Amino acid sequence: MKLHLTGLLLLTLCLSGPIITVDAQERATFLKGPKDATDQYSGLEYGPIDANDTLWRIAERYRQNNNLSVYQVMTAIYELNPNAFENGNLNLLVDGAVLKLPSERYIARIDKQKAQMRAEQDDRAFAEL
């Protein structure tokens, strides 16, 4: 009898209580990147730079989306780390520097042609040194 009353009480509570629905937006899960990540900075770093490193090789290894050019990645790395380059030239990495690596979103905003032109201009200036 006691079991029957408990079941009846539970059934009454379930039927008389308000029905609660949860909107899909309320249940959404938000993903965050690395602790230090921003829209510009991925939270990843490369370095310290040594004499064997080139920006081209670093950008080529770091690029994960083949829709982005190596030139775009190079330019984005430069923009986040201007003090890691001598005379503002993409070819003159400072030994010992640690580079902050850009987010894919930050890289994608850079114009492919302008990035390539910038790199070619720096190549010409570097050749004259």
Task: Describe the residue ranges of each PLM region.
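Cell-surface/extracellular proteins and modules involved
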Residues: 1-129
